[in-house]
Amino acid sequence: MEIIIISGRSGAGKSVALRALEDIGYYCVDNLTMDLVPQLVDMLENKQHLVAISLDIRNLPQEPETLDHILNLLQEKYPVKIIFLDTDRNTLIRRYSDSRRLHPLSVQNLSLEAAIAAEKEHLEPLVQHANVIIDTTPLSPHELAERLREFLRGNTEKELQIIVESFGFKYGIPLDADYVFDVRFLPNPHWNQELRPMTGLEKPVIEFMQKHIEVDNFIYQTRNYIENWLPMLEKNNRSYLTIAIGCTGGKHRSVYIAQQIGEYFRAKGKKVQIQHKSLEKHTQNK
């Protein structure tokens, strides 16, 4: 029997995630209180092989110790994976404004912003237990469903999936990053008028970066650091490892370096996704 617990910030996509799991054969239960989860699982043990349970802020115990105790009880008897969905504050505010729905904590006479902040604090103990954190800020419902399917495929295959992503610090650090590397100190093609409109995927920018020994040294040392600890991470029952490379705008340096590191591990036979989070913003701004 396999148990998936879906939780996260209200508005981050838990309902979408639960529907996606139902579509691939999971028996899904929405908004069950945490103290009833062990009873439900015991009842379903001989009836269902795949169970997904959605928990929101209203279903969690007030005391972190109670949460720890219940999760430990479950994990002693069953394989349990916890998927936490996160989203940045501004996106949550926009989603609630668009849907005109109330935040679950708004019943406490909190403003939307205060409710979002309070929920983040209350969910922190659960975040510490998560096997994977998915940042749904840039994801459509279809993309979130695909990310979940990838996670579950990786879980079945017991193969660590490495995500190497570039980003711009001006847009914020990715919420799902396990490692963040800051490359803003490296030579910047932005100050070259011919290179400024290009990206780190284009040949002139690549040639510019390759001319600087400090860029090669950074790539070499960073991939060696990751490679050194990768066996331990693979043994730690993880499904995803997200490595975020950031420069100022996420257009030149971080894109080039993320591409180089991702391609290196892909050539080593690792399962790698390379994503350039901020390039879409530059495309939209043209």
Curated annotation (Swiss-Prot):
Gene3D superfamilies: P-loop containing nucleotide triphosphate hydrolases. GO terms for molecular function: ATP binding; GTP binding. The keyword ATP-binding applies. It comes from the Bacteria. InterPro entries: P-loop_NTPase (IPR027417), RapZ-like (IPR005337), RapZ-like_N (IPR053930), RapZ_C (IPR053931). Keywords: ATP-binding, GTP-binding, Nucleotide-binding. SUPFAM superfamilies: P-loop containing nucleoside triphosphate hydrolases. ATP binds at G8, R9, S10, G11, A12, G13, K14, S15. Displays ATPase and GTPase activities. This is Nucleotide-binding protein HSM_1595.
